[in-house]
Curated annotation (Swiss-Prot):
Similarity comment text for this entry: Belongs to the CWC16 family. YJU2 subfamily.
Name of this chain's protein: Splicing factor YJU2
UniProt source species: Dictyostelium discoideum (Social amoeba)
InterPro entries listed in its UniProt record: Saf4/Yju2, Yju2
Entry GO terms, CC: U2-type catalytic step 1 spliceosome
Amino acid sequence: MGERKVISKYYPPDFDPSKVAKIKVKRPTFTKVTTMLPMSIRCNTCGEYIGRGTKFNAKKETVQNEDYLGIKIYRFFLRCKKCAAELTIKTDPKNSEYVCESGATRNYEPWKETDEEKSNRMTKEQEEEQDAMIALENRTLESKREMEMLDALEEIKSLNSRNSEIDTEQLLEYNLQKQELEEKLQDEEDDLLVKSIFNNKNKLELNQINDNNSINNNIDSNKIKRIENDDDDGDKFNSLFSNNNKNNKNIINNNNNNNNNINTTSISNTIETTPTTNQKTSILGNKVKVVINKQEEPIPKNNNNSEPNSFSSFMSAYSDDEED
């Protein structure tokens, strides 16, 4: 187990640790930091302007063999965000600011006065206080410089006016007229849009009214057709009903005639028979036949008066036979 885990190692007796070669570990000379630009700069490679306060992942190192009153000076390596060119800036503890070292130039800041400019201004003021002639000369030089600057500005304006065919006042008037025309056109477009919207709304309302009227007309026409069809069906039913009534009346009349004929035959048979036993059976047979015929054929209600006459005649004939 000990050999497998290599817990204990064997050192020979002639081992000299001083002779063992030391492994050089490469350590990073830079430290990565996230910084913000303390000033606005311009890239010399692509001309991109980088504003103050832009964040960068920079590499920081200490400048060798360079310090100010024992204060270390640091160098920062940056990358341009557009062309990825390397930019370097250094700390300046003497003036309490930063300096562009390579890859970029610092933008001009008129509110910031360097120490050299400040020292020159102080010496100039002291000289003017000591000697009035020097002060007078300096004032004349400053006035002369101002006059030269004004002349240069006037020349530039005259050149621009010659090159330009349109006067500034005319240009302003043209811009005002153009703006008024655009506003007028916009107002007209808005009015047309509003009118079109309202016209479409009115058209839709009219179409809806027409559709409703057409639907109502269709419904009324369908109702009229149904009523006419119902009237036709009623006429047909009435005609059929009247025909059925006529047929029923004819059938009833035929039945009445048949019953009357049967009754007359039964009565004639009873009168013609003689008082013998054989004739009784024949009379009974005829009577049975008459009764059967009455059950098979329905008797109408209108002939109730004829039925008791036939039955009474039948019973009287039967009683006469029994007495005999």
